UniProtKB/Swiss-Prot annotation:
Gene Ontology terms: biological process: pyridoxine biosynthetic process
InterPro entries: Pyridox_Oxase (IPR000659), Pyridox_Oxase_CS (IPR019740), Pyridox_Oxase_N (IPR011576), Pyridoxamine_oxidase_dimer_C (IPR019576), Split_barrel_FMN-bd (IPR012349)
Cofactor note: Binds 1 FMN per subunit.
Broad EC category: oxidoreductase
Enzyme Commission number, as recorded: 1.4.3.5
The species this protein was found in: Colwellia psychrerythraea (strain 34H / ATCC BAA-681) (Vibrio psychroerythus)
Annotated substrate binding sites: K71, Y128, R132, S136, R196, L197, H198
Assigned keywords, A-Z: Flavoprotein, FMN, Oxidoreductase, Pyridoxine biosynthesis
Single GO molecular function: pyridoxamine phosphate oxidase activity
Protein name: Pyridoxine/pyridoxamine 5'-phosphate oxidase
Name of the gene this protein is made from: pdxH
Amino acid sequence: MTLFEKLRCLFTFGQGVALPLPELSSNTTPDQIFEQWFADANKSGILLPEAMSVSSCNSDGQPSSRMVLLKDYDKEGFVFFTNYESRKSHELAENNKVALLFHWNVLQRQIRIEGTVEKVSIQESADYFHSRDRGSQVGAWASKQSQKLKYDDELKERMSHYQDKFSEGEVPHPEFWGGWRVKPHAIEFWQGRANRLHDRLCFEKDGETWLNHKLNP
């Protein structure tokens, strides 16, 4: 059996676990469905259900993706935190269009989100920064994220430096570290089904109103 034949068997084996879909109406909003699906993912025992792919694109049109952790969400959008000097932050500053993807294989579900980003407030970034464990706070100061290491022990030396510097008192919130809020204008909920006749629920924002429809798989 080839690798692709094995993968096909695994895919077929998992087709019986699809969960029911919500009924759509003109009043249905994507944040309602996201909240329910995220709760389902949490209850399923999936490791890090808050993990999501963030795809950005630079000014030359070159896309890049990476996994980050969702830290907050509401009707306004989806929030994650990072170093503002990282590659993704530079790309988001150049081009504020972004895509997110949640993939929960155990549930045969994925959520695809398209939107634009904006920085969260300094206070919101500082509040979250100070909620992190102390090691992560110091590590944010030590890491020049996405920059080349000059030698193997450089990061260890920088970590040691900041551990000494902030050995007493509160670790200050660095200005180069904070949150991005993804403000969605399109959200698609995908649910796997037998015979690859998958369900696709699509929401598109029209002004302040969310319009919904279903798509062919």
